[in-house]
């Protein structure tokens, strides 16, 4: 007899350093005994912190988290530029940054805050004509990724110190999805004409999920448990619309409801607490965006 499929939902992982996001997925596939595992929002190997992983039908919910805001704690080293904009790459230039004026640094940080155009780092997972940018760079190709709009809502300096010819900044960043913290380090260094790169990165938040929700990967391998079932995931991520049990049955079958003047996506929740679906008004219909509990009978 085949083992029953694991329950669907999300696992909030505290990713360790030295491992790709795909490595985490591979280990959780083994731990949960299912191929249906995926992640939202890639973390670089050197980065640690919040990685949201979907299990079973939870993988389909991940597509509705792509636009989530994110928060990071990071360390930026001014005085050296690298090929990858982080400590994993080769140093390509150095300039003594020990004499930088702190007020000048803060002024340039202001210029990198708000709605900005950011050129993603070349060594990234962005696809160019079907091939990831980091693969093209590895194969010796010249890569030029166009700048794209991102929002940096918080870029605060928590601490700073001079280390020889380098000027290190401990920073906290809140930003839109698609923002590269490595690129912020690079651009800050370029603006100050000394070069810059990232030496540490820890993601502290993805949408509504924080480090308080996260479990170390090693513990999940020993005891594979969901962090949130689908009902909890939907209601943590979206405002709730209370519906009747009958309406829940209709939505579970892909039917639509009469419009109610809603703005944006809501989680439709029955009196029994089941988050049946994500719904959104489209014209004269209140239609499903994602069905968490489909009724295929």
Swiss-Prot record:
GO terms for biological process: mRNA pseudouridine synthesis; tRNA pseudouridine synthesis. It comes from the Bacteria. Responsible for synthesis of pseudouridine from uracil-55 in the psi GC loop of transfer RNAs. Its EC number is 5.4.99.25. NCBIfam families: TruB (TIGR00431). It holds the Pfam family TruB_C. InterPro entries: PsdUridine_synth_cat_dom_sf, PsdUridine_synth_N, PUA-like_sf, PUA_sf, tRNA_psdUridine_synth_fam2_C, tRNA_psdUridine_synth_TruB, TruB_C. The gene is truB. It comes from Corynebacterium glutamicum (strain ATCC 13032 / DSM 20300 / JCM 1318 / BCRC 11384 / CCUG 27702 / LMG 3730 / NBRC 12168 / NCIMB 10025 / NRRL B-2784 / 534). GO terms for molecular function: RNA binding; tRNA pseudouridine(55) synthase activity. This is tRNA pseudouridine synthase B. The active site is at residue 44.
